[in-house]
Amino acid sequence: MARNCSVRRPVSPPVPETPRRYVQSGQPEGVPALELTGERTLPDVPEENYWFRRHLAVYEWIAARVDGMRVADLACGEGYGSDVLADRAAEVVGIDANPEAHDHAKARYVRPNLRFERDLVENVAGPFDAIVFLQTIEHIEDVPALLGAIATAAPLAFISTPNRLTLAPEGAEKSDNPWHLREYTIAEYRAVLEPAFGSVEIHGLFHAGKLAVHARAIGLGWDRIHSLLRITKPFYDRFTPAISASDFVLRPAGEADLDEALDFVAVCRE
Protein backbone atom coordinates (compact mmCIF):
# COMPACT_ATOMS: atom_id res chain seq x y z
CA MET A 1 0.00 0.00 0.00
CA ALA A 2 1.24 3.46 -0.79
CA ARG A 3 2.92 5.11 2.16
CA ASN A 4 1.40 8.24 3.73
CA CYS A 5 -1.61 8.28 1.38
CA SER A 6 -3.03 4.81 1.47
CA VAL A 7 -5.90 2.90 2.92
CA ARG A 8 -4.48 0.26 5.19
CA ARG A 9 -5.83 -3.24 5.26
CA PRO A 10 -7.92 -3.44 8.41
CA VAL A 11 -5.86 -4.19 11.48
CA SER A 12 -6.75 -7.67 12.68
CA PRO A 13 -6.98 -9.04 16.23
CA PRO A 14 -3.95 -10.98 17.50
CA VAL A 15 -2.90 -13.50 14.87
CA PRO A 16 -4.27 -16.96 15.69
CA GLU A 17 -2.12 -20.07 15.46
CA THR A 18 -3.69 -20.83 12.09
CA PRO A 19 -3.58 -17.69 9.87
CA ARG A 20 -6.95 -16.51 8.61
CA ARG A 21 -7.85 -17.47 5.05
CA TYR A 22 -9.62 -14.96 2.82
CA VAL A 23 -11.97 -16.62 0.34
CA GLN A 24 -14.56 -15.11 -1.99
CA SER A 25 -18.07 -15.07 -0.60
CA GLY A 26 -21.45 -15.20 -2.31
CA GLN A 27 -20.40 -16.89 -5.55
CA PRO A 28 -23.13 -17.99 -7.98
CA GLU A 29 -24.12 -21.63 -7.91
CA GLY A 30 -21.55 -23.77 -9.67
CA VAL A 31 -18.80 -21.14 -9.53
CA PRO A 32 -15.78 -22.19 -7.44
CA ALA A 33 -14.69 -19.52 -4.94
CA LEU A 34 -11.07 -18.37 -5.13
CA GLU A 35 -8.75 -17.86 -2.18
CA LEU A 36 -6.81 -14.62 -1.82
CA THR A 37 -3.10 -15.41 -2.14
CA GLY A 38 -1.61 -12.00 -2.95
CA GLU A 39 -0.85 -13.00 -6.54
CA ARG A 40 -4.04 -11.40 -7.87
CA THR A 41 -6.84 -9.27 -6.49
CA LEU A 42 -10.38 -10.59 -6.11
CA PRO A 43 -13.89 -9.19 -5.84
CA ASP A 44 -16.19 -10.41 -3.07
CA VAL A 45 -13.52 -10.29 -0.34
CA PRO A 46 -14.38 -7.27 1.86
CA GLU A 47 -10.85 -6.96 3.26
CA GLU A 48 -9.49 -6.79 -0.33
CA ASN A 49 -11.93 -4.17 -1.57
CA TYR A 50 -9.38 -1.32 -1.73
CA TRP A 51 -7.14 -3.25 -4.12
CA PHE A 52 -10.04 -4.63 -6.15
CA ARG A 53 -11.53 -1.16 -6.72
CA ARG A 54 -8.07 0.24 -7.51
CA HIS A 55 -7.76 -2.33 -10.32
CA LEU A 56 -11.40 -1.99 -11.40
CA ALA A 57 -11.05 1.78 -11.91
CA VAL A 58 -8.35 1.18 -14.52
CA TYR A 59 -10.35 -1.50 -16.32
CA GLU A 60 -13.33 0.86 -16.54
CA TRP A 61 -11.09 3.63 -17.92
CA ILE A 62 -9.71 1.29 -20.57
CA ALA A 63 -13.14 -0.13 -21.46
CA ALA A 64 -14.23 3.33 -22.61
CA ARG A 65 -11.32 3.29 -25.09
CA VAL A 66 -11.82 -0.12 -26.73
CA ASP A 67 -15.30 0.29 -28.25
CA GLY A 68 -15.86 -2.28 -30.98
CA MET A 69 -12.36 -3.74 -30.71
CA ARG A 70 -11.10 -7.29 -30.46
CA VAL A 71 -9.23 -7.33 -27.14
CA ALA A 72 -6.95 -9.75 -25.29
CA ASP A 73 -6.82 -9.38 -21.50
CA LEU A 74 -3.53 -10.97 -20.48
CA ALA A 75 -3.16 -12.38 -16.96
CA CYS A 76 -6.89 -11.83 -16.51
CA GLY A 77 -7.00 -13.62 -13.15
CA GLU A 78 -10.48 -13.93 -11.70
CA GLY A 79 -12.01 -12.55 -14.91
CA TYR A 80 -13.86 -9.48 -13.61
CA GLY A 81 -11.75 -7.15 -15.78
CA SER A 82 -12.38 -9.12 -18.94
CA ASP A 83 -16.09 -8.89 -18.16
CA VAL A 84 -15.84 -5.10 -17.80
CA LEU A 85 -14.02 -4.83 -21.12
CA ALA A 86 -16.70 -6.97 -22.79
CA ASP A 87 -19.28 -4.27 -22.00
CA ARG A 88 -17.71 -2.15 -24.76
CA ALA A 89 -15.42 -4.33 -26.87
CA ALA A 90 -16.67 -6.44 -29.77
CA GLU A 91 -14.80 -9.48 -28.48
CA VAL A 92 -12.64 -10.18 -25.42
CA VAL A 93 -10.33 -13.11 -24.80
CA GLY A 94 -9.23 -13.42 -21.17
CA ILE A 95 -5.94 -15.32 -20.88
CA ASP A 96 -4.48 -16.72 -17.66
CA ALA A 97 -2.25 -19.70 -16.84
CA ASN A 98 -3.67 -20.44 -13.39
CA PRO A 99 -6.10 -23.40 -13.58
CA GLU A 100 -8.26 -22.34 -10.62
CA ALA A 101 -8.60 -18.76 -11.87
CA HIS A 102 -9.36 -19.98 -15.39
CA ASP A 103 -12.08 -22.38 -14.25
CA HIS A 104 -13.63 -19.71 -12.04
CA ALA A 105 -13.63 -17.04 -14.76
CA LYS A 106 -15.12 -19.39 -17.36
CA ALA A 107 -17.93 -20.38 -14.99
CA ARG A 108 -18.71 -16.93 -13.62
CA TYR A 109 -18.48 -14.57 -16.61
CA VAL A 110 -20.57 -15.87 -19.48
CA ARG A 111 -21.54 -13.68 -22.43
CA PRO A 112 -21.44 -14.15 -26.21
CA ASN A 113 -18.46 -11.85 -26.83
CA LEU A 114 -16.27 -13.16 -23.98
CA ARG A 115 -14.21 -16.31 -23.70
CA PHE A 116 -11.32 -17.47 -21.54
CA GLU A 117 -8.20 -19.37 -22.51
CA ARG A 118 -5.67 -21.00 -20.22
CA ASP A 119 -2.18 -20.12 -21.39
CA LEU A 120 1.01 -18.28 -20.45
CA VAL A 121 1.00 -14.58 -21.30
CA GLU A 122 4.33 -15.10 -23.07
CA ASN A 123 2.47 -17.12 -25.72
CA VAL A 124 0.23 -14.25 -26.79
CA ALA A 125 -0.37 -14.21 -30.53
CA GLY A 126 -2.63 -11.87 -32.45
CA PRO A 127 -3.98 -10.33 -34.31
CA PHE A 128 -5.90 -8.26 -31.77
CA ASP A 129 -6.95 -4.63 -31.96
CA ALA A 130 -5.78 -4.04 -28.38
CA ILE A 131 -4.06 -5.88 -25.57
CA VAL A 132 -4.70 -5.18 -21.89
CA PHE A 133 -1.95 -6.23 -19.49
CA LEU A 134 -2.51 -4.87 -16.00
CA GLN A 135 -0.45 -5.17 -12.81
CA THR A 136 1.58 -8.12 -14.09
CA ILE A 137 4.69 -6.82 -15.85
CA GLU A 138 6.33 -6.68 -12.40
CA HIS A 139 5.88 -10.49 -12.21
CA ILE A 140 7.66 -11.17 -15.51
CA GLU A 141 11.26 -12.33 -15.84
CA ASP A 142 11.96 -11.55 -19.52
CA VAL A 143 10.13 -8.26 -19.93
CA PRO A 144 11.63 -7.16 -23.30
CA ALA A 145 10.64 -10.45 -24.94
CA LEU A 146 7.06 -10.21 -23.69
CA LEU A 147 6.71 -6.57 -24.72
CA GLY A 148 7.96 -7.51 -28.18
CA ALA A 149 5.29 -10.20 -28.41
CA ILE A 150 2.60 -7.75 -27.29
CA ALA A 151 3.72 -5.13 -29.81
CA THR A 152 3.58 -7.75 -32.57
CA ALA A 153 0.13 -9.02 -31.56
CA ALA A 154 -1.71 -5.66 -31.46
CA PRO A 155 -1.22 -2.02 -32.54
CA LEU A 156 -2.48 -0.78 -29.16
CA ALA A 157 -1.66 -1.95 -25.64
CA PHE A 158 -2.64 -0.80 -22.16
CA ILE A 159 0.02 -1.85 -19.65
CA SER A 160 -0.01 -0.96 -15.95
CA THR A 161 2.26 -1.47 -12.97
CA PRO A 162 2.47 -0.12 -9.40
CA ASN A 163 4.73 2.84 -8.69
CA ARG A 164 7.61 1.59 -6.58
CA LEU A 165 7.97 5.00 -4.90
CA THR A 166 4.50 4.77 -3.36
CA LEU A 167 4.28 1.00 -2.89
CA ALA A 168 7.63 0.02 -1.40
CA PRO A 169 9.15 1.33 1.84
CA GLU A 170 11.21 4.45 1.28
CA GLY A 171 14.59 3.56 -0.20
CA ALA A 172 13.69 -0.08 -0.86
CA GLU A 173 14.21 -1.70 -4.25
CA LYS A 174 10.76 -3.31 -4.08
CA SER A 175 7.82 -3.97 -1.81
CA ASP A 176 7.43 -7.16 0.22
CA ASN A 177 5.09 -8.70 -2.37
CA PRO A 178 6.74 -12.08 -3.05
CA TRP A 179 5.20 -12.27 -6.53
CA HIS A 180 6.96 -9.11 -7.73
CA LEU A 181 10.34 -9.62 -9.39
CA ARG A 182 10.88 -5.92 -10.06
CA GLU A 183 9.01 -2.68 -9.41
CA TYR A 184 9.47 0.54 -11.35
CA THR A 185 9.80 4.28 -10.96
CA ILE A 186 8.29 6.38 -13.76
CA ALA A 187 11.69 6.80 -15.44
CA GLU A 188 12.42 3.08 -15.24
CA TYR A 189 8.98 2.25 -16.60
CA ARG A 190 9.41 4.52 -19.61
CA ALA A 191 12.84 3.05 -20.25
CA VAL A 192 11.50 -0.51 -20.40
CA LEU A 193 8.44 0.33 -22.56
CA GLU A 194 9.78 2.80 -25.12
CA PRO A 195 12.09 0.41 -27.01
CA ALA A 196 9.12 -1.86 -27.79
CA PHE A 197 6.60 0.72 -29.04
CA GLY A 198 6.42 3.69 -31.37
CA SER A 199 4.74 5.88 -28.76
CA VAL A 200 4.15 5.54 -25.03
CA GLU A 201 1.76 7.80 -23.10
CA ILE A 202 1.70 7.24 -19.34
CA HIS A 203 -1.10 8.20 -16.98
CA GLY A 204 -1.01 8.03 -13.20
CA LEU A 205 -3.68 6.57 -10.92
CA PHE A 206 -4.41 8.72 -7.86
CA HIS A 207 -6.79 8.73 -4.92
CA ALA A 208 -10.00 10.74 -5.30
CA GLY A 209 -13.25 11.09 -3.37
CA LYS A 210 -13.24 9.35 0.01
CA LEU A 211 -9.64 8.24 -0.45
CA ALA A 212 -8.43 11.78 -1.11
CA VAL A 213 -10.15 12.91 2.10
CA HIS A 214 -8.59 9.97 3.92
CA ALA A 215 -5.14 10.93 2.60
CA ARG A 216 -5.56 14.47 3.93
CA ALA A 217 -6.65 13.06 7.29
CA ILE A 218 -3.52 10.90 7.40
CA GLY A 219 -1.46 14.05 6.85
CA LEU A 220 -3.21 15.68 9.80
CA GLY A 221 -2.44 12.79 12.16
CA TRP A 222 -5.37 10.42 11.68
CA ASP A 223 -3.14 7.36 12.13
CA ARG A 224 -2.24 8.49 15.63
CA ILE A 225 -5.82 9.44 16.50
CA HIS A 226 -7.55 6.20 15.54
CA SER A 227 -4.84 4.26 17.35
CA LEU A 228 -5.24 6.31 20.53
CA LEU A 229 -9.03 5.96 20.37
CA ARG A 230 -8.70 2.21 19.73
CA ILE A 231 -11.06 2.39 16.77
CA THR A 232 -8.66 1.27 14.05
CA LYS A 233 -10.32 -2.05 13.27
CA PRO A 234 -13.97 -0.85 13.59
CA PHE A 235 -13.22 2.16 11.38
CA TYR A 236 -11.47 0.26 8.59
CA ASP A 237 -13.93 -2.63 8.77
CA ARG A 238 -16.54 -0.09 7.65
CA PHE A 239 -14.42 2.24 5.51
CA THR A 240 -12.63 -0.31 3.32
CA PRO A 241 -15.77 -2.10 2.00
CA ALA A 242 -17.29 1.32 1.16
CA ILE A 243 -14.52 2.23 -1.30
CA SER A 244 -15.62 2.36 -4.94
CA ALA A 245 -13.89 2.74 -8.30
CA SER A 246 -14.90 6.42 -8.28
CA ASP A 247 -12.50 6.93 -5.36
CA PHE A 248 -9.65 6.70 -7.89
CA VAL A 249 -8.81 8.94 -10.85
CA LEU A 250 -6.39 8.71 -13.78
CA ARG A 251 -4.40 11.80 -14.73
CA PRO A 252 -1.97 12.30 -17.63
CA ALA A 253 1.65 13.23 -17.03
CA GLY A 254 1.07 16.89 -17.89
CA GLU A 255 -1.54 17.30 -15.16
CA ALA A 256 0.08 15.45 -12.26
CA ASP A 257 3.41 14.48 -10.75
CA LEU A 258 3.66 10.82 -11.67
CA ASP A 259 6.25 10.25 -8.95
CA GLU A 260 3.28 10.47 -6.57
CA ALA A 261 0.99 8.12 -8.52
CA LEU A 262 -0.24 4.83 -7.09
CA ASP A 263 0.03 3.02 -10.42
CA PHE A 264 1.28 3.84 -13.90
CA VAL A 265 -1.05 3.10 -16.83
CA ALA A 266 0.75 3.19 -20.17
CA VAL A 267 -1.05 3.57 -23.50
CA CYS A 268 1.36 2.06 -26.01
CA ARG A 269 1.02 2.31 -29.79
CA GLU A 270 2.97 0.80 -32.66
Predicted regions and their residues:
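Conserved N-terminal segment of class I S-adenosyl-L-methionine
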Residues: 2-126, 130, 134, 144-147, ...
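Residues lining the SAM
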Residues: 134-137, 160
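A short glycine-rich, Lys/Arg-flanked "PGG" loop and its adjoining helix->strand segment in the class I
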Residues: 144-157
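Short, glycine-/aromatic-enriched active-site segment of Class I SAM-dependent methyltransferases
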Residues: 159-182
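Short alpha-helix
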Residues: 181-197
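Conserved S-adenosyl-L-methionine
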Residues: 198-209
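C-terminal helical/coil "lid" or tail adjacent to the Rossmann-like core of SAM-dependent
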Residues: 213-246
